[in-house]
Amino acid sequence: MSLEEIIARCLEVGINCLGIADHNTLAGALKMKEIAPFPIIPGEEILTSDGEVIGFFLSQEIPSNLSMKETVAQIKAQDGLVCIPHPYDRLRFSVFRDQAFDDIMPDVDIIEAFNARSLSPGSSTRAWELARKYGKPASAGSDAHTLPEIGNAYVEMPDFNDKDEFLASLAKGKICGNRSNPTARLVSTWNRLKKRWS
């Protein structure tokens, strides 16, 4: 997907603010912030030794394969927000242990309670329970790897001007959307394998 295609898709489905969290890179999000006609929240989905974590409102890329604690510390050093994505999606190898939740939860800002690519409704239920247990705002993510997936999950929330207002607005937000077609995961997996082989 090109950045221009992503912008066109967002405009088509009525998205007026977009959080971008590519795997282990911030480059696309920062470039998108320069060219998009709507607000962009730059993020990075970072693979740690304990699982994945997302940093939002970042300005510098954070390396992968650090510990969860080290990664969270680097997000906070940039005054970013820490989001736990798809915490109970057991089809992903990146889900970390429950014990890790307890260790980092004081520094977590957001729990992704609905991920459009998570095939099990039970994973969303448990994620909601986790957010309530710790009093964290819940978010939703399309986790889009293909254009048609953009907008499958979103949050209707009041406008905001900065990171702190974003968190307050998110707490008042309404999660909307539907699960992606399971074939979307097959398509993105195939595309990833093609890149490796070429």
Name the predicted role of every residue range.
Residues 21, 44, 85, 142:
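Active-site flanking residues adjacent to catalytic metal/cofactor-binding acidic residues
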Residues 63, 73-80, 84:
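Core dinuclear metal-dependent hydrolase active-site scaffold
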